[in-house]
């Protein structure tokens, strides 16, 4: 099974060796990938799109809700920056799509620091591809239910 090509930004997502080694379950829908699909992202699989269709059948406004959530994220980061907050910990960060915390923060304050944390292997692998070697931005695979483990993780 392959990831969907295209997406809101018109790019493609190729499965990295890191993602393949991460033990991705291609047969089970995943919340991070469903959210990515509902935002128009490109890192989701047929099983995720099928589940999203079921969700949309029950709640046709769900894609709008996801976009509203993303809009709130942008406003919240901008507000924090305007008030001197320059360090961000994004727990359950999901699959990177347009308008990520680091894109917003670094556009306004290049010295800002962003740590992404997610447990889902596809989200973490794709985040590593998107983030690359950006200074002041880290990606960590950890379970946010283990607060001490998250805070002790390298990069956080």
Which functions belong to the PLM regions below?
Residues 1-142, 146-156:
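Rossmann-like AdoMet
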């Amino acid at each position: 099974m392959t990831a969907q090509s295209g997406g809101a930004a018109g790019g493609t997502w190729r499965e990295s060796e890191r993602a393949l080694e991460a033990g991705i379950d291609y047969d089970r829908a995943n919340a991070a990938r469903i959210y990515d699909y509902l935002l128009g992202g490109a890192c989701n699989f047929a099983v995720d799109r099928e589940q999203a269709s079921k969700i949309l059948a029950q709640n046709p406004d769900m894609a709008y809700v996801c976009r509203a959530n993303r809009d709130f994220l942008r406003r919240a980061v901008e507000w924090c920056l305007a008030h001197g907050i320059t360090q961000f910990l994004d727990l359950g960060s999901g699959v990177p799509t347009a308008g990520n915390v680091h894109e917003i923060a670094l556009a306004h304050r290049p010295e800002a620091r962003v740590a992404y944390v997610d447990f889902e292997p596809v989200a973490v692998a794709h985040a590593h591809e998107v983030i690359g070697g950006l200074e002041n931005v880290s990606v960590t695979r950890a379970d946010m239910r283990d607060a001490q483990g998250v805070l002790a993780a390298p990069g956080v």
